[in-house]
């Protein structure tokens, strides 16, 4: 600026003014020098004056720029403040009004009138507090008992940095403070004009825009029901013209609601979600169930209190309700116990969440204190399809939190048994706490408890540290996931002589012929011995040394229990059989044909007067899960004709093993209960079931039977086929199938292939003949790669691996 100002003045100082042309007389005289110097002096004085003002101008300019910057920053900062919608849901109790049935019908004039007044009251209440600045919108969507309860939601538009400050607890406290401040006030308060709101009956919960959208989508099919104490209320089914419905359920104040859901169709795609509040708040979801679940045909769900919501989402269109809902109020069950255990090693009782097998409720807390009789013992907890894992840092347990000896563990649903072993180091006992950390719950939890010897936790067996279970050791099957039960074995799946650790095959033990150097294999054959991997356990819980003593015609147990239930496994007088031969009538009298609409689907075996065993994968499709579809034929030989010895049955019950996993084929076993008992004959009689300790020696030749295809990809056979196969060592088969073979599986076949089961044989029996002449069920046709391919064996469900479940169901 100074240079520019100076340059503009330079011509004035350096360019003297000259009179234009000539004077009046036309003689052209110059101007007087004095005038010129005077003008120049004045110009210099003015320039120096301007120069003195320059700092002031600069200062003013800087002030203007700074002010503009501050204002610009302020306004830009203000505009950058992000406003967010904070959604709340809740309820309030009105003391001077009463609920009526008209308020359950959203289309009624009473509902519309009450809603308008209640919404006005709610808005006035909120805007009377410091929240009024942020008020956006609100809605009262339903009413309930109590004398009158209003259910609502509202939205506050707040700066993002204040979002965490306005938690539901803070908002509720502000509203309660406002209500309390006007209780005894004589001044007119707008929101108290028509409603006397109970401050203690106000509840505020966190919600979301998504929750409100879900709620609004159900209001066209909204049902409110109050169920009284001692009442079981069956709920009206959904409106099939709607895509979604909501049942708003309420019971007496001091009770909790129990909802029962029963699926009525074999197949559907409907979704039901249960909430621990009056509306569909995602953070208060108890559980969701989908599509006519076969695994859970009946579900019972507990709320934490007297309010529950059930939301239905339509799946496939149907003229029939795919489910039945009923609800009842129940009393709170205490979940605390103090127990002193007896001085014995078996299971001594059961602990469970309230109303087991109902889903445990949100806010469940159980505390069990158990005292052991001696420090020689530890406490064992045996779970069914449930395991305990170490809790991850700062993450809640979604399936129940356990606290045991200051250890925090999370529950986890699994398709396996599991045991938790707790060492005891003090006589004070052990306290076990179970807590539902979040609203999302699951099926009720049950655990068997008992003692174990801390110095010898698994007598005669191996303690698997992975799952806490006692498993057979050195039997040729890796029962423990890490395989440690089969390491360091001197004699694997054989008998070890005491004298020199020589190994002899098990069938040579107690056979009357000494094989060990000093005859130790023939010692203690007529007396009880400690129980072990291959010892047979009698009904009196004693064990005998002789392998496979069942039904051999000679009592080995003191109580004779090894010779009981032996009317089985005898042949008459005489989906997958490749390289086989046609069977004769009565040759395999336990063989079953499972048919749907006259078409053979799977094989099976008769194991008791009303029970047939088969593979679970025969029913894995929803369309095959209904018992009414199936007909069971026994004594059948030819598929296209009947003979006098064959009989047919309908199915009254279908039970899949609870641990069955479709992808891995693990626990591939199912039981069918027949609609009436069989009449035994030469053509119809059961096969023998092996004990858990029964040993099927690798290399043993056994037989499979069925109507399966005679070659891979071919049609099923018309005649019942039979073929002999050889039992394969577990390690070899597991290697062939890249370690997908589980301890509940066994393999049979030949390296060269050719003889194998095939499509249509699934569920059919693999039977082995004992020295007594009786046939024992070793396996069920399950899976394999192709049919009769070289270097691939057939894989079968190992009956000894699932025999405990079979006996539990059948007996």
Swiss-Prot record:
It is a single-pass type II membrane protein. CDD domains: CUB (cd00041), LDLa (cd00112), Tryp_SPc (cd00190). Membrane-bound serine protease. Through the cleavage of cell surface hemojuvelin (HJV), a regulator of the expression of the iron absorption-regulating hormone hepicidin/HAMP, plays a role in iron homeostasis. It comes from the Eukaryota. It comes from Homo sapiens. Interacts with HJV. The keyword Transferase does not apply. It is linked to Iron-refractory iron deficiency anemia: Key features include congenital hypochromic microcytic anemia, very low mean corpuscular erythrocyte volume, low transferrin saturation, abnormal iron absorption characterized by no hematologic improvement following treatment with oral iron, and abnormal iron utilization characterized by a sluggish, incomplete response to parenteral iron. This is Transmembrane protease serine 6. Changing residue 510 to R: In IRIDA; reduced HJV-mediated inhibition of HAMP transcription; loss of catalytic activity; autoproteolytic and HJV processing are impaired.
């Amino acid at each position: 600026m100074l240079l520019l100002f100076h340059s503009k003045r330079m011509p004035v100082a350096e360019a003297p003014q000259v009179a234009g042309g000539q004077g009046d007389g036309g003689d052209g005289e110059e101007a007087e020098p004095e005038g010129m110097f005077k003008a120049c002096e004045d110009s210099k004085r003015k320039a120096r004056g301007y120069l003195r003002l320059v700092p002031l101008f600069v200062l003013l300019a800087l002030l203007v720029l700074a002010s503009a910057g501050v204002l610009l920053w302020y306004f830009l900062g203000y505009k950058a403040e992000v406003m967010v919608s904070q959604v709340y849901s809740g309820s309030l109790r009105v003391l001077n009004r009463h609920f009526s049935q008209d308020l359950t019908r959203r289309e009624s004039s009473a509902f519309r009138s009450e809603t308008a007044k209640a919404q006005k009251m709610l808005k006035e209440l909120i805007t009377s507090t410091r929240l009024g600045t942020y008020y956006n919108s609100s809605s009262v969507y339903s009413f309930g008992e109590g004398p009158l309860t209003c259910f609502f939601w509202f939205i506050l538009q707040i700066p993002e940095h204040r979002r965490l400050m306005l938690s539901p607890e803070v908002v509720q406290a502000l509203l309660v403070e406002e209500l309390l401040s006007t209780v005894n006030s004589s001044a007119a308060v707008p929101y108290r004009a028509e409603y006397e709101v109970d401050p203690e009956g106000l509840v505020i919960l966190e919600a979301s825009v998504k929750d409100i959208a879900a709620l609004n989508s159900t209001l066209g099919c909204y049902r409110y029901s109050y169920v009284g104490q001692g009442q079981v209320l069956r709920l009206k089914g959904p409106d099939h013209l709607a895509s979604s419905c909501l049942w708003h359920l309420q019971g007496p104040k001091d009770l909790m609601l129990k909802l029962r859901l029963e699926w009525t169709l074999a197949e559907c795609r409907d979704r039901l979600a249960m909430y621990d509040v009056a509306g569909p708040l995602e953070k208060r979801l108890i559980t969701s169930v989908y599509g006519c679940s076969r695994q859970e045909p009946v579900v019972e769900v507990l709320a934490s209190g007297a309010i529950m919501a059930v939301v239905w989402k339509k799946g496939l269109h149907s003229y029939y309700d795919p489910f039945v809902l009923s609800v009842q109020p129940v009393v709170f069950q205490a979940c605390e116990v103090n127990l002193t255990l007896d001085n014995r090693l078996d299971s001594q009782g059961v602990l469970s969440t309230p109303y087991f097998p109902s889903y445990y409720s949100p806010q469940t807390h159980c505390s069990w204190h158990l005292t052991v009789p001696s420090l020689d013992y530890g406490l064992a907890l045996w779970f069914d399809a449930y395991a305990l894992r170490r809790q991850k840092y700062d993450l809640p347990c979604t399936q129940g939190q356990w606290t045991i000896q200051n250890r925090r563990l999370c529950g986890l649903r699994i398709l396996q048994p599991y045991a938790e072993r707790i060492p005891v180091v003090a006589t004070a006992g052990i306290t076990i706490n179970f807590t539902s950390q979040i609203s999302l719950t699951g099926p009720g939890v049950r655990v068997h408890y008992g003692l174990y010897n801390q110095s010898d936790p698994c007598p005669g067996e191996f303690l698997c540290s992975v799952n806490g279970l006692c498993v057979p050791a050195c039997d040729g099957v890796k029962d423990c996931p890490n395989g440690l039960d089969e390491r360091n074995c001197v004699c694997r799946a054989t008998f070890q002589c005491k004298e020199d650790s020589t190994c002899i095959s098990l069938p040579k033990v107690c056979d009357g012929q000494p094989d060990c150097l000093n005859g130790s294999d023939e010692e203690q054959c007529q007396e009880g011995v400690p129980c072990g991997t291959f010892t047979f356990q009698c009904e009196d819980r004693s064990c005998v040394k002789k392998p496979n003593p069942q039904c051999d015609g000679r009592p080995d147990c003191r109580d004779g229990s090894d010779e009981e239930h032996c009317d089985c496994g005898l042949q008459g007088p005489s989906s997958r059989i490749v390289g086989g031969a046609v069977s004769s009538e009565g040759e395999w009298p336990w063989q079953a044909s499972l048919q749907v609409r006259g078409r053979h689907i799977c094989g099976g075996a008769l194991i008791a007067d009303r029970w047939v065993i088969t593979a679970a994968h025969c029913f894995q499709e929803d369309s095959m899960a209904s018992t009414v579809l199936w007909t069971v034929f026994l004594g059948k030989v030819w598929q296209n004709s009947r003979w006098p010895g064959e009989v047919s049955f309908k199915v009254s019950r279908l039970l899949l093993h609870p641990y069955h996993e479709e992808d891995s084929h693990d626990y591939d076993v199912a039981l069918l209960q027949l609609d009436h008992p069989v009449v035994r004959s030469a053509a119809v009689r059961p096969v023998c079931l092996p004990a858990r300790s029964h040993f099927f020696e690798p290399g043993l030749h056994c037989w499979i039977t069925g109507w399966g295809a005679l070659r891979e990809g071919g049609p099923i056979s018309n005649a019942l086929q039979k073929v002999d196969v050889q039992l394969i060592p577990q390690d070899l088969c597991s290697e062939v199938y890249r370690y997908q073979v589980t301890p509940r599986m066994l393999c049979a076949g030949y390296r060269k292939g050719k003889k194998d089961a095939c499509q249509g044989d699934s569920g059919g029996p693999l039977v082995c003949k004992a020295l007594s002449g009786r046939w024992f069920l070793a396996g069920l046709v399950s899976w394999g790669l192709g049919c009769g391919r070289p270097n691939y064996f057939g894989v079968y469900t190992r009956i000894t691996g699932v025999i405990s479940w079979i006996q539990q169901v059948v007996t």
